């Protein structure tokens, strides 16, 4: 906890529901009052079947000037064409976010990742919101 930011119990609880019960497609976390990581948004929409649908939905729930952490459970096609669910941790640090906020999120990220267990890959996205979908899709398909 280098930054002094705590992780709420709800963050871990909701992550476990995503990982074990597959109740959520993704979770968006935010840092509240520079003190604690909390759940900002939970997505349970069963109509989001593909990783493309999930990425678009995530993008629609982000803001151009605010950092966020996202955990997404996405069905990714293997080279053999089989879908495998993978849990990604995404640190969203948009170009237009304030420097102080970027530093706080960057210094708190590892503590959150250590509190949860079962992440396939940890990613950092720093592009503009309009490029988020393409950037994330490219990274995911190349992992």
UniProtKB/Swiss-Prot annotation:
Keyword vocabulary terms for this entry: Actin-binding, Cytoplasm, Cytoskeleton
Subcellular location field: Cytoplasm; Cytoplasm, Cytoskeleton
An annotated Gene Ontology molecular function: actin monomer binding
PROSITE patterns referenced in this protein's UniProt entry, alphabetically: ADF_H
GO biological process, one term: actin polymerization or depolymerization
SUPFAM superfamilies: Actin depolymerizing proteins (SSF55753)
Main localization category: cytoplasm
Subunit note: Interacts with monomeric actin, does not bind to actin polymers.
Protein name, as recorded: Cofilin/actin-depolymerizing factor homolog 2
């Amino acid at each position: 906890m280098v930054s002094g930011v705590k992780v709420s119990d709800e963050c871990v609880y909701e992550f476990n529901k995503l990982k074990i019960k597959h109740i959520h497609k993704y979770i968006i976390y935010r840092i509240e009052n520079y003190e604690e990581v909390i759940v900002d948004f939970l997505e349970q929409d069963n109509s989001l079947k593909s990783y493309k649908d999930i990425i678009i939905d995530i993008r629609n729930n982000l803001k151009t000037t605010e950092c966020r952490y996202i955990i997404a459970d996405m069905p990714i096609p293997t080279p053999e064409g089989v879908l495998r669910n993978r849990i990604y941790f995404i640190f969203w640090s948009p170009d237009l976010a304030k420097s102080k906020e970027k530093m706080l999120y960057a210094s708190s990220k590892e503590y959150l990742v250590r509190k949860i267990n079962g992440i396939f890959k940890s990613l950092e996205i720093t592009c503009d919101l309009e490029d988020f979908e393409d950037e994330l899709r490219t990274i995911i398909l190349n992992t």
